[in-house]
Structures are given as structure tokens and as C-alpha cells.
Amino acid sequence: MASVPVYCLCRLPYDVTRFMIECDMCQDWFHGSCVGVEEEKAADIDLYHCPNCEVLHGPSIMKKRRGSSKGHDNHKGKPLKTGSSMFIRELRGRTFDSSDEVILKPTGSQLTVEFLEENSFSVPILVLKKDGLGMTLPSPSFTVRDVEHYVGSDKEIDVIDVARQADCKMKLGDFVKYYYSGKREKVLNVISLEFSDTRLSNLVETPRIVRKLSWVENLWPEECVFERPNVQKYCLMSVRDSYTDFHIDFGGTSVWYHVLKGEKIFYLIRPTNANLTLFECWSSSSNQNEMFFGDQVEKCYKCSVKQGQTLFIPTGWIHAVLTPVDCLAFGGNFLHSLNIEMQLKAYEIEKRLSTADLFKFPNFETICWYVGKHILDIFRGLRENRRHPASYLVHGGKALNLAFRAWTKKEALPDHEDEIPETVRTVQLIKDLAREIRLVEDIFQQNVGKTSNIFGLQRIFPAGSIPLTKPAHSTSVSMSKLSLPSKNGSKKKGLKPKDIFKKAERKGKQSSALGPAGQLSYNLMDPYSHQALKTGPSQKAKFNMSGTSLNDSDDDSADMDLDGSENPLALLMANGSTKRMKSVSKSRRAKIAKKVDSARLVAEQVMGDEFDLDSDDELQIDERLGKEKANLLIRSKFPRKLPRAKPCSDPNRIREPGEVEFDIEEDYTTDEDMVEGVESKLGNGSGAGGILDLLKASRQVGGPDYAALTEAPASPSTQEAIQGMLCMANLQSSSSSPATSSLQAWWTGGQERSSGSSSSGLGTVSSSPASQRTPGKRPIKRPAYWKNESEEEENASLDEQDSLGACFKDAEYIYPSLESDDDDPALKSRPKKKKNSDDAPWSPKARVTPTLPKQDRPVREGTRVASIETGLAAAAAKLAQQELQKAQKKKYIKKKPLLKEVEQPRPQDSNPIMTMPAPTVATTPQPDTSSSPQPPPEPKQEALSGSLADHEYTARPNAFGMAQANRSTTPMAPGVFLTQRRPSVGSQSSQAGQGKRPKKGLATAKQRLGRILKIHRNGKLLL
């Protein structure tokens, strides 16, 4: 058995807890306590000689000091080391931006959870006096020796050597001796003495706001097998010239500091994305101790915290600390729900920087799992009670859920599963939390519209403009600035600060008799336990958002003005009572009710299927709507009886932290009401290519103006060119001509079909009895097998035409609108349709459901495209020539009915159009491709040749240059259509009638196809 190696003069085995030093001569190891070498002094030794080697080689050699050349012998151009005496001297003399630009200075009684919710805990807060903070501290006569008495002199602590910016271990008793020694060879700083488990903890109580916000205080279970994170109480003992370099507190925690004695100077940097990126690069650089991070950012603020003052630094702020005089302070770190996303971001930065465990938040991921479970309970409880969470809680829940998904991925799970509590079902928690968040977001998108501060409140006064250190008798008011999008882009006027305080003071006087003076107290982490309500002259007033949730018309622009005669705003006082500033007239109330109804009707369209709330596959984003229509975006497959947000109507209700003043109201609107609301909305707009394609294909939209919405009018120049072409072709433009009759049939059929569909109910297009609906019922979807293949092909080709109807074109290119999507069928070849397809574009997440139509784009008058006019003229000339040739060949053709079909419109042309799902330019029904294996394409194309729609530029280009001879519903480009199809008809007809020899190169179908392909590939009019 091998013997255990022993070291040092004491000949004991290695002990990891004891400091040891190696002799540079004999290479043996010695305990520092055995040879008289302290750990903090070992860094100054260049060559160490043990007691045995000291006899032969002399004493240990110390490092040469360069302090004698402080002022005049300094090397020029050499950077200063962070923490050195020269660095501290230069730092003291530098000028920084004043922190008064960013920090808030409320009184202790004003600093409540409600204050942080309204003002957002995103900037530092300096409280000049501890009164009202609910904090317990020792008397100012408390000293470092008293700390040693309550903690114990044998307590091992972490001490920072400021000159080296390195950490070392030291007993508290030894540090106290150093602190009171007359000559300090080094600058030592104690900033991480956590005393929660010592007797000193009985003398210090954290601020009330910290106790209410802290996750550890409120959410950490007592029976948890993981060790409870103790980061709430720290004692900081710093000597003069102590300096802590720039850092973010572990886990993105917020921090509070109270200076009991002395002074501390904080250098603060805002945690913007750019600054965080710079900080990460600076922290990972090899010469970090030679660069002052404050020089790399745009602004670095200086904040002095003097004796008796308390500073709260929010999540993510990058800060450094300088101690100008000996200082004794208390502080602590805490995680909270006000900025969860930033906390997670700071945690990820720590992981990327490979921060040591000593400087990390203990069990950070464990507490996050508990918080995720708690937020889920909050969402469920608020929804069951018809209340709504605040925006910071929704954003925090989303950030947590994203982190949970990342931590539980298969490749990352081994690194994170050790911190997952056994009581948490991770997969179910992620799914339920995503469901609740989606419910909350959908409720507001369906009823209120997209706005950044619907869930929460916002501060309206910039930092420093109105001091928050007003006397106790003044009333502080904060208002939510709702910037809902309106039609004219205007925003509601804000209140002047003077008017706000005047009104608030009057209301405060009226409610001062309701109870004793005090503050409203909340517990953020326990939304179901209510604190006692108190009111008083210093109570906070908050605007109820009733009347501000709709901003759809111009007459709302001046409603926020307090000087007006009508104002729907009400002050919600701290006791829950609602006091209305001005009486709202009946006409104004009627306008508000009307707008609420109209918004509700548009938002709650009838959907064919139920919304699967437990499925993440139903999420869908449609980015083709413009900003002006963003507030009318309808989410697909939403439940029919969806709870709806409405302003709070109970004046005595207590608002919980993490909640806004809204109630949920169940929806009992009938389908008849919805049809009226949707038709009224659709009647105000006009169609455009892209959105109406989906509406027509899914057969969900009907209305009296539907036919007018489906086709954009041609420009005057195009219409003149078409008329000229018809005249040159000897075609009459009266109603008897095939072109006019076919166009008239299409228009009349579209009108009759749309009127019939609107009378039968929303979502039906065909006038057949099978598609009729009764009021109050859900729309009946037609089964896929009701449609044959020819109908699907017609629908596909019609959608292709309509999708390009509103696009600008010239002879060579098509110019789609900016709103066109990559999946637009007009921009790529359409794949073969399935029988059960509802003609909706493929989406990786969901099926696309009807959206609202776009507005008409103005047609540019007087614009002419030379290539188009040239093509029209050439096509018209060839048409006239072909008509003459056809008249000469009539006597040789036996099939007289075929020519009648060409020259005269058939009486049944208007009938098949009635059953088409969308307006079409075709006037002849397609034969069933399944029943007719080889349909004669040429006569069918001839019947379409006289249609006015043949000469409009709505043909969809084939991506592969294939001839579209068999697709009657998709007209070709003007030049190609007229020069190639008619000769083939004549040759084929004459060949069938008398066996006349065909033209050279056009004898077989293959030759004719090759001729057409060549024209497609090289023709000037190729689209």
C-alpha cells in the first residue's frame, strides 16, 4: 500500500483548505501558517526560500516596487493598471455625467410596488433618508469591531486585493486588525460577507420593497432539497481608495446599498444592447485590467451615496464602485418579476464568460422554475377572475418560457437537469405557460388592438423634470399614455403637469376623510393575499383606462384634455373608489359604445374550426398587412365565445400587483350581428391583389360590395388601347359583341352571386341549397369531394389572375406590391392542388384564414408603356388579318356549329359563372378533365378569343415557359395569345373538314408546341 505524501515542516498530508507556498529552491511545499507567510502577502514574493534553504541561499526575494516613480518617473504610453494608486488618483480627478439625468429620488414612503410598476424599475433610485423604507439597521455608531463581535473572528471571508483585483481568503479577525492598523501596506476590500446565518442578521432588516419583490423571500419552498440562496444581506467593509471594477451583479440581480458610515461613489452605465455587447467583449479581453470600461461607452454617470442614503440599482446596470473614505455599508441582491428578460440575459452573459461559481447566483435556474410555475398560477387566477396581467409579467413569462425550452432541449438537458426541481413537470409547465400567454395576447389583439402599454402603466414625466421628493401633502399622479394607432396617425393629447397636480390635489382632499394617512401596500408575489387598504393625503392616484382603449376616429383627439366639457377619464384612487373628473354626455357615451361594438364585431369573425388552445401548431403570423390595418388583424381559429377585455367597472375592487384595470366580458354576439359588422367593415374598403385571394379561396367573405372588390380598374391608357384593338379587328363594342357580352355576363354573375351569398350568411359563396346557412349557426364547410378537378383548376387559374390584377406590369416584367409574400402564388409556379385543399397557401404553422381587404391604390393617370401599346397594335393587326382569312375559308369548313361558337356568345355563358367561387374572365365552362381524357383545346380557346379580358394584362407567367394551351381560364400575353392560337384553330379545322395540307412546320401537335415554346422563350412580349 502506497503511503500518503506529506508536506511542510509539520509533515502532514495535503489539506485543500489551508494555504501553501512552494519553495523555489527545494521545490517542497509549506503551509503558510507554518512558515509565517500570509496568503495576501505571497503575491509580493518573487522568489521564496523556505527556512531550510534560507540558511544556504539567503532570505526570500521580494518583487521590486515601482511606487517611487509615482509622479515623474512613470513610463510614457504604458497603460495604468486598474486599482493602482495612479489609477485611483486619475479616477478621482475625472469628470463624469451627473446621475441626476437618469435616477429617481422618491421618498421612502413613495417607493412602493405600485410606484415601480408605474415608473418601471429601469433606472437607479436614490432615497435620501431611510424613513419610510421599512428597513432596520444598526445605529450609525456601529463599527467594524461590532461586526466581528456578531459574526465571529474565525469567520473566513473573501477579501479583494484592490491593486491586483484578485480575491483571497482571510479570517475576519485578521481583517479587523488590518482595518485598524496605522500602516496599511495594501488596499483590501470586503464586499461579500453574507451574514444571513449569523447573529448580525437580527440587527438588519432589508427594505420592505425588497421583501415584497424578492423571489427567494416569497417563492423558495421550505421543503426544497436545494440549498436556499442567501444573497439578501451583505456587509461591506471598505478602506480608503478601495475600488471594484465594472460588473453586473450575478444573475442580473438588482441590488440595494445603504451607507451606514462614510461614502461610496458609483459609476453607472445603462444596460443597452450595445453597452452589454461592449461589456462582454471587455470582460473577455486579455488586457481588461488596462482598460477603463467607462471610456468605451457613450455615457457613464457618477452617483455619490453619502452616509444615511440608500441606492437601488435595477437589473443589468453595469457599475463600478469607488470608496473615497473608510466606509461601512449594508446591501443585498434580489431577483424580481419586473425585468425577467434582463435577468436571463445577464445570466447568459455570465455563462458565456465562464464566470466562477463563487460569483454566480446560487441555484439560479431552480428559482426560475419555481417562478415559472408561480407566473402560470397568476395568469390562471387572473383569467378566472376576469382580470389581466401587466405587460412586464407577460413579457417575463415569455422570456422564461423561451429559457425553459432552451434548457430542456435534448442536447442541453444534461447541463441543466441538475437544477430542475423534482416537483416541476417541465414539459407540461412549458406547454401550459405558452397557452396562458397566448390567451392573454390574443384577448388584447382581438379587442383592444396592438399597443405597447395595454398591459401596464407608463411614466409620463422624464427623469428630473418633476422631482419625486415632493412634500407629504402633495399627491403624485401617474397616467398611462395610451398611443393606440388611429386612422389619421394622431395621438391623444397628454395632460399638462400643472393640471394633473391641481386635479389630483382636489381629489385627494375629497378622499382624505375616508381613512387615516398611509400607503397602499401590495405583495407582488402573492396575488391572492390582500393587504389592508389605506388612504390619505399622500395616496397615489391612477387613471382608469376606460375610454382610452379606442382611438379610431378624429373626434377622440381632444378627449384627454381636462379643460374640455366632456372627458371619459376617471381617477381611480388608492382606496378603489372611482371619481369622474367631468361628466360624460349621452352622445359621447353613445359614441364610445358604438366604437366598442364595431371593434368587437370585426375582431370576432366566425371561424369554421375550433381553436386548439393546447397546440402550438396553430400559431400563424401574417405580415402582409400594412401598418394602417395592423389593429384589424384576425388570429386564425379563435374560440367563438372568447372572453373580451373591458374597462374595470367595479370601483371598490382591489388591483393586485401585476394586473391592469380591465375585466373580461364573455361574448354572446350572434352570427347575424357579426355578418352586419363584417359587411360594414368590408364595404368601407376596397380589394387589392394578395389579401382577397385568400378571402375568395377560403370562401369566408360575402357582401353586397364583394364583386366591386375583386378587380382593380384598368388605367385609361389601357382601356383606349383595347378599344382601338377591337375597332381594328372589326369587332363591335356594343353589348352584342362577344367581348362585351362576356364581360357583362361576368359582372352580372358576380353581382348576383355576391348578393345571394350575403343573404344566406357569411362564409357561403355558392347559391346551392347545400351551402345555405341559418342565422346563429356556424358556417357549414363544403366537403372536398363536392368539387371536381375542373373546378379546382378553374379556382387555381382565377386566383392567379386576380393575384396579379392589382400589380403594375410592362412588356417584360411584373411588379408585385411590397406587401406580396414569398408564398404569393403569382410569384412562383403553383403546385398541383389536392382535392381536400381549401386553396390556402402552405404554412409551416397553420392554415391561412380570411383577412381583411386592403385599400384601393390610386391609379396613375396618363402613364403609358410603349411596349404594351406596340404589342396591342401588333396583336390587333394580326387579328384583323386572321378575320379576313377566316371569312375566305368558311365555305370549306363543314362543322358550322364550331364557327357559331366562335362568332356568337352562347346563351348559357352566364350560368356556369354563377357557381364559380371568384369572378372570372372566362365565359365558357371547362369540361371535366376526368371524364374527357383528350378535350379539344383549340375550339375552347377560340370561344375565349373575343373576350375583352383576353387583352388585359392579367395572365400569370409560367415559370418554365410551358405553353398554356389547355388552360382556358388563364389568357396568354396579348401578342402570344393572338398570333399563335388562331392559326392552329384554322389549320386544324380545315384539316378535319377537307384534309387541306397544313402550313409548313405546323402539321403535327409536336411541331406546333415547339413553335409556341420558341415564341415563349424568345418573344419580346414574354411576361
Curated annotation (Swiss-Prot):
Chain segments carrying region Linker: 65-79
Cofactor-binding details, from the entry: Binds 1 Fe(2+) ion per subunit.
Amino-acid positions noted as binding Fe cation in the UniProt annotation, renumbered to this chain: H247, D249, H319
Pfam family, one: JHD
Species assigned in the record: Mus musculus
Keyword tags: Activator, Cell cycle, Chromatin regulator, Dioxygenase, Iron, Metal-binding, Nucleus, Oxidoreductase, Phosphoprotein, Transcription, Transcription regulation, Zinc, Zinc-finger
EC number: 1.14.11.27, 1.14.11.65
A GO MF term: chromatin binding
Co-factor(s): Fe(2+)
Catalyzed reactions per annotation: N(6),N(6)-dimethyl-L-lysyl(36)-[histone H3] + 2 2-oxoglutarate + 2 O2 = L-lysyl(36)-[histone H3] + 2 formaldehyde + 2 succinate + 2 CO2; N(6),N(6)-dimethyl-L-lysyl(9)-[histone H3] + 2 2-oxoglutarate + 2 O2 = L-lysyl(9)-[histone H3] + 2 formaldehyde + 2 succinate + 2 CO2
Keyword Transcription: yes
Phosphothreonine, modified sites: T669, T670
Protein name: Histone lysine demethylase PHF8
Modified residues (Phosphoserine): S33, S84, S615, S686, S768, S790, S797, S817, S820, S843
Residue numbers binding substrate: T244, K264
Extent of Low complexity compositional bias: 733-742, 749-771, 912-932, 986-995
Domain of life: Eukaryota
SUPFAM superfamilies: Clavaminate synthase-like, FYVE/PHD zinc finger
Subunit comment: Interacts with POLR1B, UBTF, SETD1A, HCFC1, E2F1 and ZNF711. Interacts with ZNF263; recruited to the SIX3 promoter along with other proteins involved in chromatin modification and transcriptional corepression where it contributes to transcriptional repression.
Lineage, opening ranks: Eukaryota, Metazoa, Chordata, Craniata, Vertebrata
Region annotation Disordered: where it falls in the sequence: 472-497, 534-561, 732-803, 815-865, 877-1009
GO biological process: brain development; G1/S transition of mitotic cell cycle; negative regulation of rDNA heterochromatin formation; positive regulation of DNA-templated transcription; positive regulation of transcription by RNA polymerase I; positive regulation of transcription by RNA polymerase II
Domain comment, as recorded: The PHD-type zinc finger mediates the binding to H3K4me3. Binding to H3K4me3 promotes its access to H3K9me2.
Post-translational modification remark: Phosphorylation at Ser-33 and Ser-84 are required for dissociation from chromatin and accumulation of H4K20Me1 levels during prophase.
EC category: oxidoreductase
Domain JmjC per the UniProt entry, residue ranges: 195-351
Stated family: Belongs to the JHDM1 histone demethylase family. JHDM1D subfamily.
